[in-house]
């Protein structure tokens, strides 16, 4: 695009600007301060054409610097036109839902010029929306070079800094210090905007967690679907008026990277989650979410009841049945008849003592006297069989056994089994004792034992140990074991000076028969062994051993 000079570029620049805004559906607002200093406007617009060619690349791949400082005689309208031109070239209007109103910027046309070449408030609002992420850690150098303090409106461009509890990716929408009434929004708003409040209606309220924008004047909490694009508390540039007003435009400020989020209709995984520092965040409390009812405890409670119910029913049926006593025998009939007499004669009232007295008297009776009671008992049995034909003595005895089983708690059964295990432990200890004795002999070889001096003692212990577990597999292995026994025998017959070597070589055979682990220790541990024992050891190492439960020959 050719450069325009200050003379004839005024008309062309103005027509080009009007055509571009008509394409985007934006109506340029006319203000009373527009008709001043035509020559200055021409110079500014010619410089804007040059800057638009330099900055026409994507705003995502490069960090745009602040515009060069202007002279103090420039007017706020110049920066307004610069803002619209740079916005259009940097692809601000990519978002399809809110293409007509990408951001809010109310120019402060009545403001005075600031000293030392500072920018007007409208330029500050443009810069703040043009670079919403200047407060990120990667731009610390820009912070240091541009603003010593975020809220101080000096001759430097103020950089936005959020409070510590706000999300770093939250672009802020700024307002000018002009108060305006909460009028109705224009008629060309998109259908998704509420005409009463001017705030976009939530398209997917169940998917998006809203923020609640609060003004210093305690504006009512209004849910917003785009919570990360709504102005939050602690905004350092321009605060919302304390009267509390409704904004007629949707609160959006998008660069090229954010327009892709708008085009994708704000899928839940792309929207940053609200930070927990805000007390008005829309994260649902865990108690509000309906929990999944776990039915495992209830099913666990039902199954024992179902199991125990039949047994309870059976017990109740048994209790309903009357207890049928067995027919009395001859002795019981005698006791029934004579018990009152014995109680009257004796001062004892214990039933055991009375029963002993009745038993002695029963045995002292003659056969004829006893026969009388046996006859009565026979008649009693006949009468009982007629009354209860299906009765059996097993019913009563079975009930007693069941009662005993119910009375016995499972703890008693556990203690019984433990006692049985303890009774078997001494036998196991007797099997383990030879290995421990051999281990002690190998650990302390300086004390020769008298039992190893006699050749018969090891053989007896070997035969006893070989019965539960014998490591014999083939006749060849048995022959090799006999060689080891002979080596131990020769070592025991050696003179007293070689008693130490005998005590070390003799345990070679016994661990072989008891356990395989002492075999390696006994082979490796003795430093000096009799030559015959050394000849037998390679044979034992070459032959593999296996566990056999059969008794040895």
UniProtKB/Swiss-Prot annotation:
Biased composition, class Low complexity, residue ranges: 444-463
Gly residues bias (residue ranges): 1-11
Region Interaction with AES and TLE4, annotated ranges: 109-312
GO molecular function terms noted in the UniProt entry: DNA binding; DNA-binding transcription factor binding
Entry keyword Transit peptide: no
Domain of life: Eukaryota
Keywords, ordered alphabetically: Activator, Developmental protein, DNA-binding, Nucleus, Repressor, Transcription, Transcription regulation, Wnt signaling pathway
Basic and acidic residues: compositionally biased ranges: 17-32, 52-77, 407-416
PTM: Phosphorylated. Phosphorylation by csnk1e promotes binding to ctnnb1 while phosphorylation by gsk3b may reverse this effect.
Disulfide links within the chain: none
DNA-binding region: 324-392
Region annotation (Disordered) ranges: 1-77, 183-213, 392-474
Keyword DNA-binding set for record: yes
PROSITE patterns: HMG_BOX_2
Predominant localisation class: nucleus
An annotated GO BP: Wnt signaling pathway
Region of interest (Interaction with CTNNB1), ranges: 1-61
Localization per Swiss-Prot or TrEMBL: Nucleus
Family: Belongs to the TCF/LEF family.
Role noted for this protein: Participates in the Wnt signaling pathway. Binds to DNA and acts as a repressor in the absence of ctnnb1, and as an activator in its presence. Required early in development for the establishment of the dorsal body axis in response to maternal Wnt signaling.
Quaternary structure (record): Interacts with csnk1e, ctnnb1, ctbp, dact1 and gsk3b. May interact with ase and tle4.
Name by which UniProt lists this protein: Transcription factor 7-like 1
């Amino acid at each position: 695009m050719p450069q325009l000079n200050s003379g004839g570029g005024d008309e062309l620049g103005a027509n080009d600007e009007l055509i571009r805004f008509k394409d985007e559906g934006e109506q340029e607002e006319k203000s009373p301060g527009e008709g001043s200093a035509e020559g200055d406007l021409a110079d500014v617009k010619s410089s804007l054409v040059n800057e638009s060619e330099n900055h026409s690349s994507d705003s995502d791949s490069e960090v745009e610097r602040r515009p060069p400082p202007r002279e103090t005689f420039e007017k706020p309208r110049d920066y307004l036109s610069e803002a619209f031109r740079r916005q259009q070239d940097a692809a601000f209007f990519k978002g399809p839902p809110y293409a007509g109103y990408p951001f809010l910027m109310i120019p402060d046309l009545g403001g005075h010029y600031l000293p030392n070449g500072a920018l007007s408030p409208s330029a500050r609002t443009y810069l703040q929306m043009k670079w919403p992420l200047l407060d990120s850690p990667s731009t610390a150098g820009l912070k240091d070079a541009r603003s010593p303090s975020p809220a101080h409106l000096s001759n430097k461009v103020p950089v936005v800094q959020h409070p510590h509890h706000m999300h770093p990716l939250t672009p802020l929408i700024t307002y000018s210090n002009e108060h305006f009434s909460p009028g109705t929004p224009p008629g060309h708003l998109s259908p998704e905007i509420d005409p009463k409040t001017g705030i976009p209606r939530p398209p997917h309220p169940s998917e998006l967690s809203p923020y609640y924008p609060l003004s210093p004047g305690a504006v009512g909490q209004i849910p917003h679907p785009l919570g990360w694009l709504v102005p939050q508390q602690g905004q350092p540039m321009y605060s919302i008026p304390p009267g509390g007003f409704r904004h007629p435009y949707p609160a959006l400020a998008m660069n090229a990277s954010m327009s892709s989020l708008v085009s994708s209709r704000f899928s839940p995984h792309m929207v940053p989650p609200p930070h927990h520092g805000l007390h008005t965040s829309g994260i649902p409390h865990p108690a509000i979410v309906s929990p999944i009812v776990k039915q495992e405890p209830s099913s666990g409670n039902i199954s024992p009841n179902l199991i125990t119910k039949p047994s309870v029913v059976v017990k109740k049926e048994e209790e309903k049945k009357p207890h049928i006593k067995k027919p009395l025998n001859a002795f019981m009939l005698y006791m029934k008849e004579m018990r009152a007499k014995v109680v009257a004669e004796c001062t004892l009232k214990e039933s055991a003592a009375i029963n002993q007295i009745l038993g002695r008297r029963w045995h002292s009776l003659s056969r004829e006297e006893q026969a009388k009671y046996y006859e009565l008992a026979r008649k009693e049995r006949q009468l009982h069989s007629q009354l209860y034909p299906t009765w059996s003595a097993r019913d009563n005895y079975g009930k007693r056994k069941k009662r005993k089983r119910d009375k016995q708690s499972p703890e008693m059964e556990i203690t019984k089994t433990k006692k049985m295990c303890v009774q078997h432990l001494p036998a196991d200890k007797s099997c383990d004792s030879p290995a421990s004795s051999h281990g002690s002999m190998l650990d302390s070889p300086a004390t020769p034992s008298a039992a190893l001096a006699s050749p018969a003692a090891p053989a007896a212990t070997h035969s006893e140990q070989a019965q539960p577990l014998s490591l014999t597999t083939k006749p060849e292995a048995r022959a090799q074991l006999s060689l080891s026994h002979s080596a131990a025998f020769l070592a025991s017959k050696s003179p007293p000076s070689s008693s130490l070597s005998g005590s070390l070589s003799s345990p070679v055979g016994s661990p072989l028969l008891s356990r395989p682990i002492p075999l390696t220790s006994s082979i490796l541990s003795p430093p000096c062994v009799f030559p015959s024992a050394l000849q037998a050891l390679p044979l034992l190492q070459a032959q593999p051993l296996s566990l056999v439960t059969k008794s040895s020959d």
